[in-house]
């Protein structure tokens, strides 16, 4: 996304459009823990959507819209949300731990290609 913004600006010289928009900032491990822990988050990605409850003990309960529920584990590490999911009828092999950058603020966050909003 940044490269697209830079490419768009390259052809516009000597024009002042005001201060640049703030880029999303990375979050610390403590930030991610405080944001997610004990709360339910509605998420939407390219292939699925649903709601996840992130428990403070590092477990999660995941409801995938139209597919069912599964459990998982989560942790924060180096500005990333790391998640693994247990097998379920719609997810026969489960998903091993995978980490993706988490950015955002307020009640809207981005994890990989998914958008999270407070449920």
Could you describe each region identified by the protein language model?
Residues 9-119:
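Lipid interaction determinants
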């Amino acid at each position: 996304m940044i490269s697209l913004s830079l490419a768009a600006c390259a052809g516009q010289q000597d024009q002042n459009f005001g201060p640049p928009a703030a880029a999303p900032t990375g979050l610390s491990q403590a930030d991610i823990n405080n944001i997610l822990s004990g709360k339910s988050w509605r998420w939407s990605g390219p292939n699925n959507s649903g709601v996840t409850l992130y428990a403070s003990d590092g477990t999660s309960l995941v409801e995938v819209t139209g597919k069912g529920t599964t459990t998982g584990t989560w942790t924060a590490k180096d500005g990333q949300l790391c998640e693994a999911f247990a097998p379920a009828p719609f997810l026969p092999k489960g998903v091993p731990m995978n980490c993706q950058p988490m950015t955002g603020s307020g009640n809207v966050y981005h994890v990989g290609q998914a958008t999270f909003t407070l449920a």
